[in-house]
């Protein structure tokens, strides 16, 4: 409640906080959705642990919305760098490893890790599959060059094809061949990254984002390593 009010006052913009009601694995969501106006005053508060539907009218034209300032963005960056550096130090890790796909998420984690522990202590592993684009590999190589860290290429295509053949997943099946094949790729990458972590004493950094974590959009035993 206080956080929502603070954000509304800071940005001079109404904030609508919508929260799930119910249990999801080991997490219980309590609902209690709320709306704060541009002054930070709570103008609607839902009951906790009950489903709730309501309509609220807001003037979103005035005052003009204000985005996150550069100072706030810099504070977030500093917090993430400190978090990586401190976690590694307190758990006796001096080196890290991560999977680099060429996308924004893994690229951002790589940049933060290079700053936190030093580029010389970071290994970025590219693990192309039959579905990897040439652009993603090129982008990954360019990032590694800019950061000055070590890069490795560990293709998963051969292992992926063998597993599909062994489990007969390459042939049409009833409901779910594409999902199984997609998740197998992530899990194979997880095996490679954990092997490097164990063999070289490197901390494995996850490259998922908070949106994926919030809705559970990830592969168990793959992205969750």
Predicted features along the sequence, with ranges:
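Active-site adenylate/phosphate-handling loop in enzymes that bind or generate adenylated species
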Residues: 1, 117, 147, 170-225
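CN hydrolase (nitrilase-like) catalytic-core segments centered on the catalytic cysteine
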Residues: 1-50
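Generic beta-strand/beta-sheet core signal
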Residues: 16-18, 36, 98-101, 107, ...
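Catalytic P-loop NTP-binding/switch module of NTPases
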Residues: 36, 42-43, 51-81
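A conserved beta-strand->alpha-helix junction
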Residues: 50-57, 121-126, 130, 134-180, ...
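Phosphate/ATP-binding catalytic cores across multiple sugar-kinase/actin-like superfamilies
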Residues: 75-97, 190-196
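Conserved helix-loop functional segments at active or binding sites
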Residues: 85-94, 115, 119-122, 162-165, ...
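ATP-dependent adenylation/pyrophosphate-handling site
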Residues: 94-100, 104-141
């Amino acid at each position: 409640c206080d956080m929502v009010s603070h954000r509304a006052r800071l940005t001079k913009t109404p904030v609508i906080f919508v929260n799930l009601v119910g249990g999801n694995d080991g997490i219980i969501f309590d609902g209690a959705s709320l709306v704060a106006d541009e002054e930070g005053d709570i103008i609607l508060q839902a009951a906790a642990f009950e489903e709730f539907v309501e309509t609220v009218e807001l003037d979103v034209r005035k005052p003009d919305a204000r985005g996150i300032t550069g100072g706030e963005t810099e504070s977030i960056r500093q917090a993430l760098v400190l978090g990586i550096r401190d976690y590694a130090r307190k758990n006796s890790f001096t080196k890290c490893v991560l999977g680099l796909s060429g996308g924004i998420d893994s690229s951002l984690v790589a940049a933060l890790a290079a700053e936190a522990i030093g580029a010389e202590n970071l290994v970025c592993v590219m693990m192309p599959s039959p579905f990897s684009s040439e652009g993603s590999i090129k982008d990954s190589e360019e990032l590694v060059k800019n950061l000055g860290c070590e890069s490795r290429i560990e293709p998963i295509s051969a292992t992926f094809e063998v597993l599909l053949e062994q489990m007969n997943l390459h042939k049409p099946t009833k409901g779910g061949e594409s999902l199984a094949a997609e998740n197998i790729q992530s899990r194979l990458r997880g095996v490679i990254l954990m092997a490097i972590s164990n063999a070289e004493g490197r901390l494995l950094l996850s490259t998922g984002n908070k949106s994926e974590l919030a809705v559970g959009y990830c592969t168990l035993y793959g992205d969750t390593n």
